[in-house]
């Protein structure tokens, strides 16, 4: 059940077009899906050191969200890349911070030791995918996912079509706020519609082999009973039921997606407002009553 929410008449898009939202971190499950497709084809080993997958190394961009500024980069030490794998990046156990905007990329702890949410890990994974496929993320996602599923209103960077149909995001006070990504950021630059994202989730839920990779041996999220993290998705295990879920939070937008793994019922909720997370949570609970301890994490705001 896809749900899109806008605040007022000024949020309407031109007649005859789809209402496109910025999905923020709902990009991460899509990138995980693309990554696991390569795993199932034998083109990627989840436990192979990243250093072996990036023969030319990795240059971390510190000012990633300064979209109009020249890049400020640092080369990540090879010995650090040797400790990282696609599995640790997908499960947020890499030890990388969420973001490192003011200095070189460094580990907070030894990879695999614990869970810590990391956008930087998915940006690194984006470079791995580019190296393995020879395609930038937008092209790879289009060929592998968007075109086959008919996701006509989804992209990892701004295009003329996206710009025409993009719902204006809003601050809590109602001011228009949104980012227009001229390049792909695997962690957060997805543009899509609720219906497109629901189709993506349906494809995932129908793919038992890939779904089993997502949910196998998840890691516990600290101080969050019954909440775990798999490969690309959060996992709740409550009252003999299991759910996968993720949220998105970015300038002007909030979003949530959840699916019941027992019934395969799913909900996607987008809000074009920075105070829209309570609305998104209420939409989730209307269809999937819960309880949902994952939605109580401090990150999900």
Descriptions of predicted regions:
Residues 1-4, 18, 22, 113-114, ...:
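Catalytic loop of the DD-peptidase/beta-lactamase superfamily, centered on the K-T-G motif
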Residues 1-3, 99-103, 157-158, 280:
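Short, solvent-exposed loop/turn and secondary-structure capping segments
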Residues 5-120, 133-135:
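Active-site-proximal loop and beta-strand segments within enzyme catalytic domains
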Residues 30-32, 121-126, 195-199:
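Well-ordered alpha-helical segments within folded domains of soluble proteins
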Residues 56-64, 145-155, 220-225:
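Short, mixed-charge aromatic SLiMs
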Residues 74-81, 160-186, 234-236:
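Carbohydrate-binding/catalytic loop surfaces
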Residues 94-98, 150-154, 209, 219:
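Generic structural signal for secondary-structure transition and capping sites
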Residues 107-111, 115, 131, 150, ...:
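A small/polar active-site loop signature that marks catalytic segments
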